[in-house]
From Swiss-Prot:
InterPro entries: aa-tRNA-synth_I_CS, aa-tRNA-synth_Ia, Leu-tRNA-ligase, Leu_tRNA-synth_edit, M/V/L/I-tRNA-synth_anticd-bd, Methionyl/Leucyl_tRNA_Synth, Rossmann-like_a/b/a_fold, tRNAsynth_Ia_anticodon-bd. The gene is leuS. It catalyses: tRNA(Leu) + L-leucine + ATP = L-leucyl-tRNA(Leu) + AMP + diphosphate. ATP binds at residue 583. PANTHER family: LEUCINE--TRNA LIGASE, MITOCHONDRIAL, LEUCYL-TRNA SYNTHETASE. GO terms for molecular function: aminoacyl-tRNA deacylase activity; ATP binding; leucine-tRNA ligase activity. It comes from Mycoplasma mycoides subsp. mycoides SC (strain CCUG 32753 / NCTC 10114 / PG1). GO terms for biological process: leucyl-tRNA aminoacylation. A motif ('KMSKS' region) lies at residues 580-584. It comes from the Bacteria. Belongs to the class-I aminoacyl-tRNA synthetase family. Keywords: Aminoacyl-tRNA synthetase, ATP-binding, Cytoplasm, Ligase, Nucleotide-binding, Protein biosynthesis. SUPFAM superfamilies: Anticodon-binding domain of a subclass of class I aminoacyl-tRNA synthetases, Nucleotidylyl transferase, ValRS/IleRS/LeuRS editing domain. This is Leucine--tRNA ligase. Its EC number is 6.1.1.4.
Amino acid sequence: MDFSHKAIEKKWQKYWKENNIYKTTNNSEKKAYILDMFPYPSGAGLHVGHIKGYTATDVYSRFKRMQGYDVLHPIGWDAFGLPAEQYALKTGNDPREFTLQNIENFKIQLNKMGFSYDYDKEINTADPNYYKTTQWIFKQLYKKGLAENRDIDVNWCQELGTVLANDEIIEKDGLMVSERGEYPVVKKKMRQWVLKITDYADKLLDGLDNLDWPNSVKELQRNWIGKSEGCEINFKSNDINIPVFTTRADTIFGVTYIVLASENELVLKLTAPEKLEEVKKYIELTANKSEIERKDESRTKTGVFIGSYATNPLTKEQIQIWISDYVLNDYGSGAIMAVPAHDKRDWDFAAKFNLPIKFVIQTKDQSKAFVGEGIHINSEFLNDLDRIQALQVIHDYVDKNNLGKRKINYKLRDWLFSRQRFYGEPFPVLYDKDNNIVLIEDNNLPITLPITDYIKPTNTGESPLANVKNWVNVKIGDKEYKRETNTMPQSAASSWYFIAYILANSKNNLIDLTSDEAKKRLEKWLPVDLYIGGQEHAVGHLLYARFWTHFLYDLGLLPTNEPFKRLFNQGMILGPDNRKMSKSWGNVINPDDVIDTHGADALRLYEMFMGPLDASLPWSFDGLDASLKWLNRCYRMINKIEFSNTNNHKLDYVYNDVVKKVTQMIQELKFNTAISQLMVLVNAIYKEELNTVYKPYIEGFVKMLSLFAPHLSEELWEKLGNNSSVTLQTWPEFDETKIIKNAVVIALQVNGKLRSTIEVEKGTDKETLIKLAQENENIIRFIKDHKNLKYIAVVDRIVNIVIE
């Protein structure tokens, strides 16, 4: 007899909700804060790929509850975002209404899966009660000099009508396009809010060392921050100083030209009049190229000589000044000293434009750039020195002669923090008639979005909010002000949402971050103990969240400077065709359909059993069928067998061994192998005689199964005569003494040669060993045609059959 998943799921979901089974407790000194990367509530809803990560955190949360931990396992909604705004533009509907509808659909889907979220902790980043604190944190950043309004080169997307951050852009066919919609993106100078994350570069680097994160993610962040130690050397062109950052100042005697990024503010100042038109055309051409294309070393180099020269401060040689797209303005000073003999890109450029090449590091092969280690040559006082020696000497020389200075440089850029959108957090900022910035008082927060039909982009670079004049214009006393009309990026809210869950008393009801109660809660729950989500957030959300946590820690508001103690990146679930799930491929699997046909427990079990949690694997309906088949086997086992309260000890070894292994495997997030162990236990139980299976062992099995199949496990727990939720039970213990295996392996030999082995209980007598050897299939093949056999048996060791 199989179980009815539809009846069971409804029954127990109702029970969990009515009895508030998953409410966060505050009874233990042990805590476990287990967190999903919260979803953006899109209109498409969830697919089975989303379910994988959520199931993993749910399994671990249930495990920790049963181990006696207070568990915080919340859910919320990253609700601001461009998709809702685009929907509103197409339909004329308010994006807030659209978002709330999507949230309700998401909640229905999540509840169907039996996830153990505490909905009293639910948050919505687009709710004013939430973004009141987002606005307050921005104010603190501004007060500490970490938020600035400045004119900068930005990534402008005309189609979306907004500025995009670097992590919101991808490269396609050599051009910059928006990640969402793949619309063209160009560089444009605009006045924007930025957060000075660069001030925290060293703290963010140092903090990575002690995090239990995948090395790949930590390395991505290290490379994104990109710390390099070097020297900034001043080259002069007439009276204009050109600062050049380099990590290889020791090669300065090999500099044969200088290259500026086309965006460098010195370009037009240095360009000769006769070259101005050509230079401007090249600058315009470069603006449409992606950073990825510009960094591509394999492509043909392009550039323009600007008609001016600079002086090498050491050799006093006059060298040409060029602009080229292979030099980026946002690294160093946006200028390089070109040493073509020892840099491949410089070599390719020099070869293309027939520029001089001078070797200053000894090499036998001067037919290509030499980038290895060697002794310096053609370098005056650096001759015969190796790289490390030469760097020390040249840095001292530059310092002593005021030719530059030692400098640490970072690839990390300040965080572009404003968007020309309607649907985002308003800034708590006013401008007076002289354009001075005035912060809105705390007691006037939150500043909410207006109810308006004017949400179309202005196409002037301003936010749609600029159209809402009765919102923009503010009068306080006899003074008139204008509101900031840009809104914050979606990444603002996600930079502190893990804190918001702790502050939540009930849905979207947050206590003050600065209160004594907040301090008490934060000290208990932070940092997050396990955070599961995709690696694609490595240099976006994960970096920004670390920055805000470090900042709030420095304000004395948090007990830790790192938000996420342990991070795990789950793999993707691919379509049955082994491609990424996509509507365009037609390979998306809807969990609602799977739940209808197979049930939530089968879906949960299958996704955790299909392979290692961090592996990306294709969806298989055969695997799903097998999971349901096994759950039915578990159901039949408990309905079929009458259990005993007396232990006959036959299952002692396998039960205790399985409990020990499953406990360790769950802790290590090896869910697929944990499920395999449960299958081992079920097989062992089926081999036992009816009415002899020890009931506490069956109960221990159901407890372990409940992590993966909570609905069925509740039903089985009730069937065993229990009247409380299996979720609230303690995790099964194992007896180490029962795992000492009372068995030995006996070697079976024929004429002294090993032909087979058997496993028997220790102390098995000689007669039994000989009988088992005679029945062994491999041994039979060797002795079947012989009659004169002599058997030599040694207890616990060997049986040797001698053919006479």
